[in-house]
A protein has these predicted regions:
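Divalent-cation
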Residues: 19-133
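Hydrophobic alpha-helical membrane-embedded segments
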Residues: 67, 98-117, 190-214, 288-300
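Hydrophobic alpha-helical segments characteristic of transmembrane helices
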Residues: 128-177, 182-208
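Hydrophobic alpha-helical transmembrane segments
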Residues: 152, 188, 192, 255, ...
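Polar-ligand-bearing catalytic/cofactor-coordination segments
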Residues: 41-52, 56, 60-62, 130-133, ...
Length: 353
């Protein structure tokens, strides 16, 4: 189902050029690649009675327990939407209700949904750029190719930058400084290097104009979710009163993942570089699942452990979220309203716990 709304027109937001197809494709490829790398960061968790969401290119995706909606503002000022029912992975496969496995299932579904939302927004931005020069079929095929190419490239980049490089440098440092050459020392250096690379990556991309706009939509998503959770009428004016950093943001989750990884890697009985590298890849689902359980456990103790686990993520969200404009907040509200309408149409009930 798709809908349109024209309000709060903005100046054109696409910074691509039309100087040639190769230039456009390369810029678009790099833009998609960066967005895919950011998917876990831009994701906000959804619980049984709450809503969650994610920023996409020039828009926001909002989801409720059984539905989701992507809203994107085109350069003309129109808001285009796509809303669909959403079945939880744990409802179809009960095994994903078990501890640890439920965290893996939740992240996999969130990434899959994030890719669909990103695909939708990328298609509409491509239409803005191409106009009527290409058929819809051609645009879809180009977008699908670019998306899948970016998924593969992003996965390889993730493994290389956050698994291979930190371990390689930590092993080299351990040979250079014998005191850091123990298993514990190498794992500590490995974790610190990984954290520095992550923070450096965030800082560098935050300087990009396109990504800064995504961070503004990320802030809009958080403000609107806060507005909804407060019980106040969800309006642009009410949403703008809230802060942009939210405790359920994927930024907080990723930091917990990094700390959990350091603890689990320290238990590995391997000494060879190859064995440690393979184990780091193989243990990714375990690390994700354990991190999810820690966040879930801490969420029930909001004044104690939850505050400790989420505070670094809240600080980091000063980078990954930025104050949105009223027009950007309106897009987030539009996505939320459509997701809620579909949720209620399916017999669901949205209440605040």
């Amino acid at each position: 189902m798709r809908g349109m709304l024209a309000r709060w027109p903005e100046t054109p937001h696409c910074s691509y050029t039309r100087d040639g197809a190769s230039s456009l494709n390369l810029r678009g490829f790099l833009r998609l690649f960066t967005h895919i790398q950011l998917l876990p960061i831009l994701e906000s968790g959804e619980e049984t009675t709450l809503v969650g969401g994610q920023a996409v290119m020039e828009g926001v995706m909002m989801r409720s327990p059984h539905s989701y909606c992507v809203a994107v503002r085109k350069s003309s000022g129109e808001i285009v939407t796509e809303e669909k029912p959403l079945a939880k992975l744990s409802d179809r496969h009960p095994a994903f209700k078990l501890p640890v496995l439920r965290g893996v299932g939740t992240l996999c579904q969130a990434m899959w949904l994030g890719m669909k939302a990103l695909h939708f927004s990328a298609n509409h931005l491509a239409e803005d750029l191409d106009g009527d020069k290409a058929s819809k079929k051609e645009k879809k095929e180009l977008s699908s190719w670019a998306m899948w190419a970016n998924v593969g490239f992003s996965l390889a980049f993730f493994i290389f930058l956050y698994k291979f490089v930190p371990l390689y440098l930590a092993t080299w440092f351990g040979h250079l400084v014998p005191a850091a050459g123990s298993r514990f020392g190498i794992n500590m250096v490995d974790g610190l290097i990984r954290l520095v690379l992550f923070l450096g990556f965030l800082y560098l991309i935050s300087r990009m104009k396109d990504i800064r706009r995504v961070f503004e939509y990320h802030g809009a998503e958080h403000k609107v979710v806060f507005n909804f959770e407060s019980g106040q009428p969800v309006t642009v004016e009410n949403a703008q009163q809230f802060v942009t950093w939210h405790p359920r943001c994927g930024t907080s989750f990723l930091l917990v993942v990094m700390v959990t990884a350091m603890a689990i890697y320290a238990l590995l009985p391997f000494d060879s570089f190859t064995a440690k590298f393979i184990a780091r890849i193989a243990l990714l689902p375990v690390i994700i699942g354990v991190s999810y359980e820690l966040i879930r456990f801490a969420a029930k103790r909001r004044q104690g452990l939850m505050a400790v686990l989420t505070q670094p993520g809240l600080w980091l969200q000063r980078i990954t979220t930025q104050p949105p404009s009223n027009a950007q907040a309106e897009v987030a509200i539009h996505a939320l309203n459509h997701a809620m309408e579909l949720e209620k149409a399916q017999g669901g009930e949205l209440v605040i716990a």
